[in-house]
């Protein structure tokens, strides 16, 4: 009976070993630790000796020489020991030319085997993304240097998905390197280095100055303040949860730079990097150190995206623009709406004659319509927070002769004058300025509209329903939800191809009259692609009140008796 129990324990351990041998992810450290524990067997038994042989061979194949070295002396047969020492030397020599390793502060090397399932020759391998993990590094709490990348001179992609190495050797030998990705995750760091607080990895130990073919740098959890890179222009620098400086943004010649939730080491960012075409910086001021000023006047960038969010206090004070900008997003919000905030000053906006697309949050920067450059083609107003405009403010967009898309998710005004150039309009307002009684778009020429009115307030008081909502003759596509209007007039819209009207409001807030165009043709609403419509036709009236009068309702429209009007499939 005792022998049977021993055999079961041996088989269980052997199965565990065979399973773990297939595990390649560094996240399996705890599983690997299971098989490093001693088992309750007689070391001189045939079963245990067989187990040792398999265990040693597994260690050697994954270049864990220090573990194999501990076990070889436990082999009872001298010839077997000699055979494994020969095998040890074979794999050790292989590791020198086909592996990598951690160089510890003591000078010792812990070898790492590169994950290479297709067994491509090291000199030809183009992508290195993972290793067979050395789990005992978890308990060392040591800073290390990574060695061995020179064995892979053809690498085009180098990715460290969970890396806390402070220095990497032989990067200069990767002449074909195009993409370098490194992630240092805080939670994983604290799991590995149990006695140290996490801080972004200092990239001073990474020298990329000789990698002239670099195309993309993708970093998460690192400090790029001291990073050395090639002087050649690359495509992308992406940094998340890290640290950057004004100098690093100027010294790294990337056409696109994306910074997200990272600390700005400098209060002022003065960008003169001529390589940058697009700069995006998104900051959560509650978790990251924000900057107070950004000046791109002397740069050549065309696209600028600046967003700062926080709970109570805005840090950014001023944005100085350059005349080459064609796409601008300025936004962010303060969660505490009751805390007065200073608006962000935009310098040079009215001079941006090349600006095609502008997206802004009025709570961040309440731009006056008179300051909008005349060549804008897309205007997007939205975001959380207050709308610091007044009833007397002008919202005259008529001078924007090239405006094609107008999107406003914040407000509408009795003083609003839209450009006749608009082709598509998107309205999702919650606030009203001025004495708004009706919305009459009959003088405009847009072909597409997506509008949700909901509950409108003026000075925190809900407004009564609009008297009339009138749409232009040019309209082809309409999605209208909760119109908050007594009359919805579509009588001019004889070119309609897609119509969706939803009115979930009831009682006095429901639409009183819906006027459709006369002589609508069923064939005009035949849809070709999937959409919100459930059948073959792009025509649907939903949640329509039983008291609502529908004028000119076509005979080919079917009413289900519950407020839905649609077209049956052919």
Per-segment meaning from a language model:
Residues 436, 443, 452, 462-463, ...:
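Eukaryotic tandem repeat interaction scaffolds
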Residues 20-23:
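Bacterial Sec-type N-terminal signal peptides, specifically the leucine/valine-rich hydrophobic h-region
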Residues 238, 356-361:
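Predominantly recognizes leucine-rich repeat
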Residues 8-16:
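Sec-dependent signal peptide recognition
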Residues 160, 238, 380, 479-480, ...:
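Short beta-strand elements of solenoid repeat domains
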Residues 443, 456, 474-477, 491-492, ...:
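Extracellular beta-rich repeat passengers
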Residues 486-487, 505-512, 517:
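Acidic, glycine-rich calcium-binding repeat modules characteristic of RTX/beta-roll
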Residues 2-3, 14, 26-196, 202-212, ...:
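N-terminal capping/linker segments that flank leucine-rich repeat
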């Amino acid at each position: 009976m005792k022998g049977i129990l021993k055999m079961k324990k041996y088989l269980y351990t052997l199965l565990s070993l065979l399973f773990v041998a297939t595990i390649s992810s560094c996240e399996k450290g705890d599983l690997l630790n299971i098989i490093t524990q001693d088992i309750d067997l007689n070391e001189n038994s045939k079963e245990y000796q067989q187990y040792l042989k398999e265990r040693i061979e597994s260690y050697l194949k994954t270049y864990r020489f220090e573990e194999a070295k501990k076990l070889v002396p436990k082999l009872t047969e001298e010839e077997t020991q000699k055979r494994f020492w020969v095998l040890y030397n074979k794999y050790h020599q292989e590791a020198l030319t086909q592996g990598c390793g951690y160089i510890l502060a003591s000078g010792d090397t812990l070898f790492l085997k590169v994950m290479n399932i297709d067994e491509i020759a090291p000199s030809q391998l183009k992508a290195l993304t993972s290793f067979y993990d050395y789990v005992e590094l978890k308990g060392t709490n040591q800073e290390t240097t990574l060695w061995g990348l020179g064995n892979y001179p053809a690498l085009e992609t180098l990715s460290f998905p969970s890396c806390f190495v402070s220095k990497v050797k032989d990067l200069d030998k990767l002449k074909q390197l195009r993409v370098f990705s490194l992630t240092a995750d805080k939670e994983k760091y604290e799991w590995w280095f149990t006695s140290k607080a996490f801080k972004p990895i200092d990239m001073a130990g990474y020298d990329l100055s000789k990698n002239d073919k670099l195309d993309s740098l993708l970093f998460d959890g690192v400090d790029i303040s001291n990073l050395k890179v090639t002087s050649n222009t690359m495509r992308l620098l992406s940094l998340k949860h890290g640290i950057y400086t004004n100098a690093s943004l100027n010294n790294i010649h990337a056409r696109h730079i994306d910074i997200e939730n990272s600390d700005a080491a400098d209060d002022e960012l003065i960008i003169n990097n001529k390589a940058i075409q697009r700069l995006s910086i998104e900051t959560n001021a509650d978790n990251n150190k924000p900057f107070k000023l950004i000046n791109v006047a002397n740069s050549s960038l065309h696209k600028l995206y600046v967003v700062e969010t926080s709970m109570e206090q805005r840090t950014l004070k001023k944005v100085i623009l350059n005349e080459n900008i064609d796409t601008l997003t300025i936004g962010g919000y303060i969660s505490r709406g009751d805390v007065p905030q200073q608006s962000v000053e935009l310098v040079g906006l009215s001079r941006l004659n090349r600006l095609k697309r502008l997206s802004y949050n009025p709570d961040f920067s309440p731009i006056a319509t008179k300051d909008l450059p005349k060549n804008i083609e897309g205007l997007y107003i939205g975001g959380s927070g207050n709308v610091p405009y007044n009833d007397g403010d002008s919202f005259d967009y008529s001078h924007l002769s090239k405006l094609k898309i107008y999107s406003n998710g914040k407000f509408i005004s009795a003083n609003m004058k839209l450009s006749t150039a608009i082709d598509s309009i998107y309205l999702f307002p919650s606030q009203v300025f001025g004495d708004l009684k009706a919305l009459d778009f009959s003088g405009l020429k847009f072909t597409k509209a997506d509008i949700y009115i909901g509950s409108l307030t003026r000075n925190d008081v809900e407004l009564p329903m609009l008297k009339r909502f009138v749409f232009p003759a040019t309209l082809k596509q309409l999605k209208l939800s909760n119109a908050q209007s007594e009359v919805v007039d579509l009588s001019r819209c004889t070119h309609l191809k897609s119509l969706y009207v939803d009115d979930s409001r009831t009682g006095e807030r429901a639409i009183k009259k819906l006027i459709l165009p006369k002589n609508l043709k069923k064939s005009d609403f035949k849809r070709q692609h999937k959409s919100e419509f459930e059948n073959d036709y792009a025509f649907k009236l939903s949640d329509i009140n039983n008291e609502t009068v529908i004028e000119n309702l076509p005979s080919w429209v079917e009413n289900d008796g519950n407020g839905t009007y649609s077209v049956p499939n052919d």
